[in-house]
Amino acid sequence: AVPRFVSILNREAEISIHLERPSVDQLVTRKLTDYRLALYASRAYLDRHPPIEKREDLAAHAWIDYVDDLLFSQELKLLSSFCRNPKVVFHSTSVIAQHQAARSGLGIAVLPCFMAAGDPGLVPLLPGEGIERSYWISSRRELHKSVRLRVLWDYVVELCAHEQGLLLGESS
């Protein structure tokens, strides 16, 4: 599956959440939240492979990653932050499929902490090593004054602020 884009400029949606800050004048945009990604693998995978104690150990392991040719954002180019020339054994455009591949023991995945930290089927690797990224929220300028839109906007912003620990991998 390839992520489907909707255009708030073409009125396909009223609010959009992005991996990168949109640079369109017709939009009201603000940073929604920071979030953290980290390395995870299943206990079964770790039991079958050499131990991972430092970054240099990662080169000997199997990896799970996005399909490079189908990346819709450079923010998803994550593996190079951890390993040069990784041996990728599973590619998917879906972070959910990557999560399941890691749970099933295929290899190491870079996953959002809010998705993986509370999963008993995954073990976090190299504590303290991770990547921080941001989500951005936007709406069309002419709709931003709408009470209905602002109620939802404010709710999403408040929810992310309340769940900051989860988003940054500090709690699960």
Could you describe each region identified by the protein language model?
Residues 25-64:
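Flexible hinge/capping segments at coil-to-helix
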Residues 59-81:
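Secondary-structure junction motif
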Residues 11-16, 37, 102-108:
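Alpha-to-beta junction loops
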Residues 20, 43, 112-114:
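Short secondary-structure boundary segments
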